[in-house]
């Protein structure tokens, strides 16, 4: 699995409300979260499909 996918979900420090997806290593699924728009980490994908492709979800 891509190491970025193992990072914890991080909403970032800003207050925008961007719908994004992250890989939840506990459920082994890509799940929706609201991204604040800045900072955060690499476990942050614009689409569920992109998250699933990068993180190897089947």
From Swiss-Prot:
Annotated signal sequence range: none
Record SMART domains: KU (SM00131)
Protein's cellular compartments: Secreted; Nematocyst
The keyword Secreted is annotated on this UniProt entry: yes
Keywords: Disulfide bond, Ion channel impairing toxin, Nematocyst, Potassium channel impairing toxin, Protease inhibitor, Secreted, Serine protease inhibitor, Toxin, Voltage-gated potassium channel impairing toxin
Cited InterPro entries: Kunitz_BPTI, Kunitz_BPTI_sf, Prtase_inh_Kunz-CS, TFPI/VKTCI-like
Matches recorded under Pfam families: Kunitz_BPTI
GO CC term (a single one): nematocyst
Record-level Gene Ontology MF annotations: potassium channel regulator activity; serine-type endopeptidase inhibitor activity; toxin activity
Cysteine disulfide partners in this protein: 5-55, 14-38, 30-51
Residue numbers marked as site, Reactive bond for trypsin: 15-16
Keyword ATP-binding found: no
SUPFAM superfamilies, A to Z: BPTI-like (SSF57362)
Domain called BPTI/Kunitz inhibitor: residue spans: 5-55
Protein family membership: Belongs to the venom Kunitz-type family. Sea anemone type 2 potassium channel toxin subfamily.
Protein purpose: Dual-function toxin that inhibits both the serine protease trypsin (Kd<30 nM) and voltage-gated potassium channels Kv1.2/KCNA2 (IC(50)=1100 nM).
Protein name from the UniProt record: KappaPI-actitoxin-Avd3c
Taxonomic source organism: Anemonia sulcata
């Amino acid at each position: 699995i891509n190491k970025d996918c193992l990072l914890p979900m991080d909403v970032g420090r800003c207050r925008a409300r961007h719908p994004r997806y992250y890989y939840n290593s506990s459920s082994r699924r890509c799940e929706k979260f609201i991204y604040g728009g800045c900072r955060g980490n690499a476990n942050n994908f614009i689409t569920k499909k992109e998250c699933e492709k990068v993180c190897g979800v089947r």
